[in-house]
Amino acid sequence: MKKVYQGKTKDVFELDNGNYLLKFKDDVTGKDGVFDPGENSVGLSIDGIGRANLETSVKFFEILNNAGIKTHYVSANLEEATMEVLPAKVFGNGLEVICRYRAVGSFLRRYGSCVEEGAKLDCYVEATLKDNDRCDPLITSEGLEALNIMTQAQFDSMKSMTQKISNIVRDTIAEKGLELYDIKFEFGFYNDEVILIDEIASGNMRVYKDGVIVDPMDLTALLLDK
């Protein structure tokens, strides 16, 4: 088993069968020791968050697969905090796609002169390039096409999937009395189709209860009835 990529919250290994293995770590993105899924660097470590993120991911991947939505998920080993996935090809050097229901985080930092904190957004989708040196810059569908990263048809498919998946996650957590403010995904290309890759983890979403943000570990416990 060969390590092919070292990420902020996961390491990636190539398996003999051609698939990949994701090893979840106890690191989360944030700043000054405060959790923030919108940051592009590791801000703190939380004991057990790697397994927690994996458990949450497995729950949602199985929901999506049952709904007929294509993902890279194959299987998981909770004890080892690993997940086997299909070898999907990333777009460019990687894209992150954010779906927003409320104005918080980097959206508020960018557009705070035009919108109040917590204002409702209608399943707003935006994409960023994975580029730590440039702080994960925003990019439009036209920009992605001009740079030969993604076609307009692929972008449209990705956007539609993002909204569909986000609504499934939103409705699922609403059953626990929780509200999804925003969530981050990654997509890849496999068998000529755009599919969801990476994870659907507590550390990749902002969830609130009674107007207060829910800690990722607490969120996992609520979602998994622990």
Please give the residue ranges for each predicted region.
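Active-site loop/lid in soluble adenylation, ligation, and acyl-transfer enzymes
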Residues: 1-129
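Coil-to-beta-strand transition motifs
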Residues: 19, 92-94, 177-180, 191
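Short histidine-centered catalytic/ligand-binding loop motif
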Residues: 37-52, 134-161
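A short glycine-rich, hydrophobically flanked beta-strand micro-motif that places a catalytic Asp/Glu
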Residues: 72-79, 174-189
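Conserved metal-phosphate-binding beta-hairpin within the catalytic cores
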Residues: 99, 180-199
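Phosphate-binding core of ATP-grasp and ATP-grasp-like enzymes
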Residues: 123-135, 166-179, 202-205
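A long amphipathic alpha-helix within ATP-dependent nucleotide-binding catalytic cores
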Residues: 149-181
